[in-house]
């Protein structure tokens, strides 16, 4: 197990845990674009043990909470649409 982690980090550049967390956070950004999914829904869907754990990982990776990221993205999207039309 330790050998696998060392090899993985050597070839990928990050630990397996960090790699999987990054994948989950990237996927969560897609799910957060759907207003029908709450942050709690997204957290459990991606296998986080709690919404708090998800929010902490998201904030550490992205720099914003999932809810603030969603709001900022939606505002940016609305702004782009209003400029276009």
Regions found by a protein language model. Give the residues of each.
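Short hydrophobic/aromatic patch on the recognition helix
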Residues: 4, 8, 53-54, 58
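Terminal helix-turn-helix DNA-binding modules in bacterial transcription factors
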Residues: 9-52, 71-85
């Amino acid at each position: 197990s330790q050998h696998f982690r060392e090899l993985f980090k050597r070839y990928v550049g990050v630990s397996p845990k960090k790699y999987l967390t990054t994948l989950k956070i990237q996927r969560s950004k897609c799910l957060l674009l759907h207003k029908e999914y709450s942050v709690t829904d997204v957290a459990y869907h991606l296998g986080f043990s709690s919404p708090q754990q998800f929010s902490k990982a998201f904030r550490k990776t992205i720099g914003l909470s999932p809810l603030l990221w969603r709001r900022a993205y939606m505002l940016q999207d609305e702004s782009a649409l209003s400029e276009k039309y």
